[in-house]
Amino acid sequence: MKLECIAPAKINLALHVIGRRTDGYHLLESLVAFAAFGDRLSVEKAEADTFLLAGPFRDGLEGSGNFVLNARDLLREKFASRASSPVAITLEKNLPVASGIGGGSSDAATGLKLLTRYWEIETEPAELAQIGLGLGADVPMCLFGQPLIASGIGEKLEPVSTLPSLPILLVNPGLPLATPAVFSSLVERENAPLPPAPRNKSAAELVNWLRLTRNDLEPAALSIMPVIGIVLRLLQTEGALIARMSGSGATCFGIFETASKARQAGEMISRRHPGWFVRATQTRASMPELSHV
């Protein structure tokens, strides 16, 4: 039996930094959506554990530090003999690393879902989310995999079930950006919270709501990597209704009126910057399905 599933890109449509705890963790409020595009993960029966990397961003992800292998090992630590049988894991890495769109966290979350299904381990969503939190603050929201408001340090999740699908263009200038460096460069750590969550809104109404919000990490990221400003200006020039950085960067997204306009903008930017990661996709209203092959 082979199981596979997409590990979707996580898009912070809005991200407000509203405080800082005494332990140093920042308090956030973020409207999060997930894209129809992402990495792809599969697991299948094997005589011995194997881990195969494929895709354009596979380099440098070998070894014990990989989020997927950490997810496998954490499940074995918790469930012992129930998770002992060997497994062949393949990760097709389609998302840039350290790019603000949750690639590693989404990989870990998808690994947890696939492996618990493969080993026939029954867990409650809350239990799996707690396991995921041990792998990273963003893993629980990636396990949820649907539009949501994240708060606290990212562990408090409130579903936003009526968020419309949005045509978006993802653009990364081909440079990794470390999250700790961005948070360390923050000047203001106590900002206004998000407006009331958008519900039952059309795509146009959602865009208007987003114009009332921001990504508070964007100025700090720009101070470290000024090319992010070029990305944002290009998205605006090519017709994005709104252009913003996702997460701690450096990936930016543009929301477009139609999928066709997003693709056309992507083609134009790719021609001007062939070394950049450019992908037209859309946000999705539900989590990706696990499939048997």
Swiss-Prot record:
Catalytic reaction list: 4-CDP-2-C-methyl-D-erythritol + ATP = 4-CDP-2-C-methyl-D-erythritol 2-phosphate + ADP + H(+)
EC numbers, comma separated: 2.7.1.148
Active site: 10, 138
Gene3D superfamilies, sorted: 3.30.230.10, GHMP kinase, C-terminal domain
Protein name: 4-diphosphocytidyl-2-C-methyl-D-erythritol kinase
Keyword match Kinase: yes
One MF annotation (Gene Ontology) recorded for this entry: 4-(cytidine 5'-diphospho)-2-C-methyl-D-erythritol kinase activity
Binding site for ATP: 96-106
Associated pathway: Isoprenoid biosynthesis; isopentenyl diphosphate biosynthesis via DXP pathway; isopentenyl diphosphate from 1-deoxy-D-xylulose 5-phosphate: step 3/6
InterPro entries: GHMP_kinase_C_dom, GHMP_kinase_C_sf, GHMP_kinase_N_dom, IspE, Ribosomal_Su5_D2-typ_SF, Ribsml_uS5_D2-typ_fold_subgr
GO biological process: one example: terpenoid biosynthetic process
Family: Belongs to the GHMP kinase family. IspE subfamily.
Domain of life: Bacteria
UniProt KW keywords: ATP-binding, Isoprene biosynthesis, Kinase, Nucleotide-binding, Transferase
Record function comment: Catalyzes the phosphorylation of the position 2 hydroxy group of 4-diphosphocytidyl-2C-methyl-D-erythritol.
The keyword Transferase belongs to this UniProt entry's keyword annotation: yes
